[in-house]
C-alpha cells in the first residue's frame, strides 16, 4: 500500500511524521508527505479566495490519480470514527490525501475526490498532517488486527 499526503504548505512536522512513517512500514505501507507551495499560490492568496482555491487545484491536479483513492480533507465533509476511516482505506493500494491551503478547495476539485473531515475544528497544516498520519497508522492497525487501535 502507498499513502501520499499532498498539502499546500511550506514544511512538515518531521519528527512525529517520521515515527508514523516507520510504524506504517510494519504493515507494508509507504507513507509519504509532499508539501507544495508554488509561487503562484503565495501570490493568489494575497488577491482573492477564488484565485487561491484555483492555485491549489492547479498544484494538486497532476497528483490526482484515477487508479488511486483520492481523498480531500474538508471540514464540512463526511466524518466518522477510526473504524469508518479504516473501512474507507481498506482494499486500496494507492491512496492520495489532499490538504488545501487556508481558503479550502474549489468545488470542481472536490468532485474528483472523496471528501473526508478529520473534525469540525480547524487545524493548522502541521497538526492536520500529524492527526492524519496517526489515523492512517491506526486504520492499518485496525485492518491488520494489531492491538494499537484499542
Protein language model features and the residues they cover:
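Loop/turn-to-beta-strand initiation segments
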Residues: 2, 93-101
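General small-molecule cofactor/ligand-binding pocket signal
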Residues: 6, 32-34, 116
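Cofactor-binding loop segments of dinucleotide-utilizing enzymes, especially the Rossmann-like FAD-
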Residues: 8-10, 36, 75, 100-101
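Short, glycine/polar-rich helix-capping loops at beta-to-alpha or helix-loop-helix junctions
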Residues: 104-108
Amino acid at each position: 500500500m502507498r499513502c501520499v499526503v499532498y498539502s499546500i504548505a511550506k514544511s512538515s512536522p518531521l519528527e512525529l511524521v517520521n515515527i508514523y512513517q516507520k510504524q506504517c512500514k510494519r504493515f507494508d505501507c509507504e507513507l509519504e508527505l509532499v508539501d507544495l507551495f508554488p509561487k503562484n499560490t503565495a501570490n493568489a492568496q494575497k488577491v482573492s479566495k477564488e484565485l487561491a482555491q484555483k492555485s491549489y487545484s492547479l498544484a494538486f491536479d497532476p497528483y490526482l490519480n484515477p487508479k488511486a483513492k483520492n481523498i480531500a480533507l474538508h471540514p464540512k465533509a463526511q466524518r466518522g470514527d477510526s473504524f469508518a476511516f479504516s473501512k474507507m482505506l481498506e482494499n486500496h493500494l494507492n491512496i492520495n490525501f489532499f490538504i488545501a491551503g487556508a481558503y479550502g478547495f474549489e468545488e470542481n476539485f472536490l468532485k474528483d475526490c472523496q471528501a473526508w473531515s478529520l473534525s469540525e475544528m480547524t487545524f493548522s497544516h502541521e497538526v492536520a498532517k500529524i492527526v492524519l498520519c496517526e489515523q492512517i497508522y491506526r486504520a492499518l492497525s485496525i485492518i491488520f488486527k494489531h492491538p494499537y487501535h484499542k
